[in-house]
Amino acid sequence: MNAALIAALLILGALTLDATAYSSTCERIPCTNNSDCHGPDLCQCRPPRGDDFGYFCSEY
């Protein structure tokens, strides 16, 4: 039981680490076009997804 719990926590930690943003300067900055997004070249103004209503800078 303990080994299964430890393995599950390690897998969850690895998945969470992969889901973190690459650049803290790019994520979740409100924008109207790509020039508003200062940061890496991959940082672009993206349309809203889901319940978001505004455009935000993102690397994805």
Swiss-Prot record:
Q: Which UniProt keywords apply?
A: Disulfide bond, Hemostasis impairing toxin, Platelet aggregation inhibiting toxin, Secreted, Signal, Toxin
| Tissues expressing this chain | Expressed in salivary glands.
* Source superkingdom: Eukaryota
UniProt motif Cell attachment site: location: 49-51
What subcellular locations does the record give? Secreted
Please report the PTM annotation for this entry.
Answer: Contains 3 disulfide bonds.
Example of a GO cellular component annotation carried by this entry: extracellular region
Residues spanning the signal sequence? 1-21
Which GO molecular function annotations are given, in alphabetical order?
toxin activity
Q: What does this protein do?
A: Tick salivary platelet aggregation inhibitor that plays an important part in the anti-hemostatic strategy of ticks. Inhibits platelet aggregation induced by ADP, thrombin and thromboxane A2 (TXA2). Blocks platelet adhesion to soluble collagen (most probably through the binding to alpha-2/beta-1 integrin (ITGA2/ITGB1)) and binds to purified glycoprotein IIb/IIIa (ITGA2B/ITGB3) in a dose-dependent manner. In vivo, reduces thrombus weight effectively in a rat arteriovenous shunt model and inhibits thrombosis in a carrageenan-induced mouse tail thrombosis model.
Q: Family, per the entry?
A: Belongs to the ixodegrin family.
Q: Which protein, by its recorded name, is this?
A: Ixodegrin YY-39
The organism of origin for this protein: Ixodes scapularis (Black-legged tick)
